[in-house]
Amino acid sequence: MKKLFSLLLCVVMVFSLVACGSKTDDTQTPDEPQDTAPELSGTMKVVATGDVYGPLFDAFTADTGVEVECLSMSSGEVLSKLRAEGGTPSADLWFGGGIDAFMSAKDDGLLEPVTFDAAAELGDEYKDTEGYWYSKGITIVGFLLNNSLMEELGLTAPESWDDLTDSQYEGEIVMSNPAVSGTNYAVVNALLQAKGDQGWDYFDALNNNIAYYGKRGSDPKNKVSSGEFAVGISYIDASIEQAAEENDLTIVYPSDGMPWVPEGVAVFKNAENVDAAKYFVEWLFSSDDHLRQLAEIEQKSGIKVIKPSIEGIELILRSS
């Protein structure tokens, strides 16, 4: 077990145990018109954590004429791919994933810095001081239960992280591998810090119940939805809520705390269309309209933490 998680202790980050919901205000102040976009062309290739961002990228295309191609990939996969590509990235923009992977990419010299005036409005802890990455939101983590399978197996619903170590869940828990998933890397960090000296004992007990460590962040959602496993440790966002509605699943917000992790945005060094990618970062963060659109797509309000001055978004803290 310790071998699985040992590499996760290289970076120590503090993650609060709380969760953010999403709500937009009815009254919004339109943005001031932005400066004319620079002369851009071609296609911007994006690696993202999901395939739901089409409307946002369509808006960028409408403003700039730059077409966008998007590939879904976890942050750990992106980092491994970057290193394998040896300084010649196949994509231009990195959109989403745990911020620890972005920090590692910066240290490895794989990112291109981006600076723009509106960055001053972002919280210092949610951006790199040299502009190598910015946070676009916050991901929270909870549990996803297959109601039919839980009933069939006679399982009681877990309410806390400690509950997951109960022997009744042996062989019925799925979790994305923290060595690949930036979000679950953050979960490990947060729980180790919260539990102190008992942290490794906790993960030894949890490991006894986990039947499968997925390679993708979406594996818990997919495998719980299909009935392969009863319990998934998963990020919680709009796609999870939709899956819960469509597949008779229950989302559980752990009573003993919900780890959360900032999600990154960055431009790859030596990217083929680096100008378009750098402008996209400025385009996104310089416009409250674009950030509100992103919040609506993700059904998250965490951008309010990152950019407190944004109007039209109300931060909601979930406890159940």
Question: Which residues fall in each region the model found?
Answer:
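Short, polar/charged alpha-helical segment
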Residues: 47-69, 83, 143, 242-243
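Periplasmic-binding protein-like
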Residues: 168-176, 202-207, 213-214, 246-269, 284-317
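Short, low-complexity disordered leader/linker segments with a strong preference
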Residues: 1-44
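Extracytoplasmic ligand-binding site segments that recognize negatively charged/polar headgroups
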Residues: 47-54, 73-77, 89-228
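A ligand-binding cleft/hinge motif common to bilobed small-molecule-binding domains
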Residues: 100-104, 225, 230-248
